[in-house]
Amino acid sequence: MEDKIVEIMKKNGINVTRIDRVTNSFSSNAYIVCSNNEKFIFKILYNEFKQKEEAKYLELLENILNVPKLLFSGNLDDKYFNVMTFVEGKSICDEMVNTLSFENIYNIGCLLGKLHNVDVSDKNENSWQKYLIESLSKTYQNLKFVSLNDKVYKYLIKCVELQKNEYDNVLLHLDFRLGNIIFGDETYLIDFESMKNGDSCFDFLKLYRILNKKEFKLFLKGYESIRKIPINLNERLEFYNIFDAYTSLNWCYERKTINSDFYNKNIKILERKFK
C-alpha cells in the first residue's frame, strides 16, 4: 500500500520521504505523508460516497472554519482516497479529557457553534427523521442476536415519532469528538465523511459524555457566544445517547468488530438504561 501511495503522491508533484500510519482513525485508513519540510494526510475512505462527501464539505468549509485544505482525490485499487494538508497540533483521546484547559473547552464550543451556523444544503425538515428511522431499522435487522434488541428499538422508534420537526435543522458533523479536533495555534476540525443536516443537539453528545458539569457549562458558553443553545438540550441528549449507543453496535457489526472495547462500551450504555 505504501509503495502505491508514494507513486500517487509523486504523480501529483510530491516526493515522499516518509509515511506513518495514523493510529486513532477508526472509520478510515489514514497516513501522514512527509515530503521534506511538508506533511500531508492520505486518507482512504470506507466507500466512494464517504470520499465524495468529505471532499464536498472540506471545500464548503475551507473559508468558514479551521479545516484541512483538500488537495486532490482519487481511486486506488477500488479504494477511494482524499489527500489534504496536515494540521499541526495535538489530538487527544477521551481518556485524556482532563488535560484540556478551560480555554480549550471554550474554543471547542465556539467551533461547534460556527459549524452549526453554516447554511444547510438540505432544507428538507423531514430528512433527519428519515435518517434516524432508517438507521434504527438497519440496526434492528442486524442485531437480532442482541438480547436487548427489541426493547431498545421500540423505545427509540417511539422517541423519534415524538420528536418530529421539533429540532433546530443545522449542518451536523455527526462525529464531533475529541479525536476529531486538533489543538494548536488555532482549534481545527477534521473528519467530514459522515456530515449531514439534522438536529443540532446530536453534535453535543460526545462531549456531554466525557465532560463534567462545570466543563460542559463552559463548552456551552463557548457555543452560546456564536449561536443560541438548542431548547430541551438535556432531554434530547438522553435520547441521542441511547440512539448512538445502539447504532454504534451496528457500526461494529458491519465491520466485524463486535468483540471490541468500543462495542462493549456501547452495550453497557444500553444495559444501564434497559436492565
Spans of features found by a protein language model:
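An alpha-helical support segment within catalytic cores of ATP-dependent transferases
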Residues: M1-I14, Y106, N117-L174, K265-F274
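Structured beta->alpha junctions
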Residues: T23, Y46, G74, E193-K196, ...
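Helix-rich C-terminal or lid/interface subdomains of diverse kinases
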Residues: S27-S28, Y106-N107, K206-K275
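Active-site acidic catalytic loop and adjacent metal/ATP-binding pocket
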Residues: N29-C34, F42, I157-F204
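Generic structural signal for small/hydrophobic residues in well-ordered secondary structure
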Residues: A30, F42, L70, T85, ...
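ATP-binding pocket architecture of kinase catalytic cores
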Residues: D20-E125
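Conserved N-terminal boundary motif of the eukaryotic protein kinase catalytic domain
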Residues: G13-R21
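Glycine-rich, phosphate-binding/catalytic loops in enzymes
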Residues: L58, L100-S101, Y188, L205-L207, ...
